[in-house]
Amino acid sequence: MELKLEQQEIWENIWLMNERMITIIPRGLLHLAGKSYINGFKKKAAMHAERQLKKELHPYDWQIAYREVSDNTFEIDITECGLKKLAHDFDADGLLPGICRMDYMVSYLMGNGFERTKTLGDGDDCCNCRYHREGLCAWSPEKGFEGRR
């Protein structure tokens, strides 16, 4: 990358910067915000899928398949990623999949459950995201991301 940093170092700086911004908010408020965020995200994902069928999305938007599993859980398969397209157009492909891993940190800090085994940033065919309003999510980059991309 242009800054002459190793890819892992870039990702770790991105994670640290975002973690510091997010943790300014007290933990109790973060957990409350997490529930609200997931509820809103669930509604927006369903509407996004409808807009997608009508071809009303910006070229840098996400292409998704949305599935409601239960009141607590929903899944989104992302088949086209706006961030990946943008990173590519600005010759910043090396930011991925490091930025993809942010989902784990944000879910962990907000007290939501999150799982994923594939990402477009890792070269997979989709990002297979599973969100839980109530649940656990580990943020442990030191353990690596094999099996939880």
Which positions does each model-derived feature cover?
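Amphipathic interaction/junction segments at domain boundaries or subunit interfaces
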Residues: 1-90
